[in-house]
Every structure is written in C-alpha cells, then in structure tokens.
Amino acid sequence: MPCSEVHFLKAEIYARGLAGITANLATAKTEYEAGITGSLNFWTQAAINSPVWVVDKPAGLPSGVAINAVLNNPIVMLDPTDATHATQQIYAQEWIDMIRQPWDAWTLLKRTGGLTPMDPDNAAGYVSTYGNFNRYQYPGSEKTFNLVNWSASTGGTNLVSDKIWIAK
C-alpha cells in the first residue's frame, strides 16, 4: 500500500470521525494534503523510472512550488467547513491515485457507495452502467474445474449483479 493511500485513509478517518477518533477536519486536511503530495511524488517517480516514457519525461520530483500550486487549486483544496464534501474530495483524490490499481479503485467505489468521481452531466448513465456491479465474474475454468464449490458460492449464477458473500 503506497504512503498516499495510507494518508487518504487517515484523512477519511479524521473527516468522518471513525474508529473512535473524533472528527477533525484540520487533521483530515493535513493527511489529505500529505496523500496528494505522496501521490504526485510516486507517479512522477514512476514516470522518471519508466523506460517507455521519453517525450517530456520529468527530470525530477515536483518542487514545493508545484505541489503547493496543486494543493491551492480551488477544486483540490479540502473544504474545511463541510465534512461530507471533504470526504467526497478525499475519495476523489484517492480514486485518482489508484489509476494503475483498478481493483483497488473498484473496491473504493463499492466501499464508498459510489462516491468516487463520475461525470455530473451523466450521473444517471453512470449508475445504470456501473451501479449494478457487485463483483467480478468467475472465469469459466472455475466452473469447469471446481463445480461443487462454484455452485455453492454462486448459487449457480455468475452475474456481476450478484452480491459477494460479505455483502449479502
């Protein structure tokens, strides 16, 4: 788990007041900004290390000025007055950070009840397209080679709309 994800999870805990922690948006903001900074550094380092990236390849990690420009962008700045909006902002940045971890991003979508970014002009289309996904389908080989357990687990269907056992 990258440091950015740890910071985003801590930001959520402080924003929502989870696990016996008193809600504190100031501390949530500190963790949120540390998560964004960690994400920017991680993905920039990935670009630097990439043998494929040759055009406009970053020469180094983002400067403090560049990071502050991102953190001070009105769209990115954590809302210090509204815990619900702040939590959605945390989820959005965590989702962006998970760009190369689609399974984790999908889990975040499910864990947050669909509060990850979506096109606001097509929210209904997003929900009708992706909102019924509860799990990945088992590969056909699972049914072929493990029919008894597959049947017990799925009830004989292999639909993405079927809930996983922990969500039933």
Where are these regions (language model features)?
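Acidic/polar-rich alpha-helix caps and helix-coil junctions
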Residues: M1-K168
